Amino acid sequence: AIVSTDSYNYFGRDESFLDKKLLPFVKSSGYIYIAIPGMKKDCHDKLPPELLLSWTPKQLEYMHDVKYWTDMVSKCAGAEVISVNEMESNGEVWADWLKQDNEYAVGDRKSMEAGGGKYLNFISIVLRKK
């Protein structure tokens, strides 16, 4: 199995990434588990001002909704999509992240304190190699 936490959204937006770069390292019928920050609904056409308190439009290009990620991983020829869902632990995950003292978590607090959390979630993706 491969487990990816809080990183797949950076490189997984390339449609060929799963088939070419990740699946060669997974045995037949093996699993890929992905957890990434995302948006409840893509709003890149009109980014809410709350989100722009912490992130630039370019930084937000890495965050998408469940539909986007479902469409993206469904293009993979070598894996079966088991599930793509908003994580039930969304609020808890964000709260844990914001408690961290690293510069990124501290910077994210501005948006979340202004109500940006209503636009964001965490997404779980489970795939099985064919």
Regions of interest found by a model, annotated:
Residues 83-130:
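Conserved Class I S-adenosyl-L-methionine
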Residues 8, 37-42, 86-89:
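Short "lid" loop at the C-terminus of a central beta-strand within the Rossmann-like core
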Residues 60-78:
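Short alpha-helix
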Residues 12, 27, 74:
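Short conserved AdoMet
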Residues 3:
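A conserved beta-strand element that flanks and buttresses the S-adenosyl-L-methionine
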Residues 37-60:
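Short, glycine-/aromatic-enriched active-site segment of Class I SAM-dependent methyltransferases
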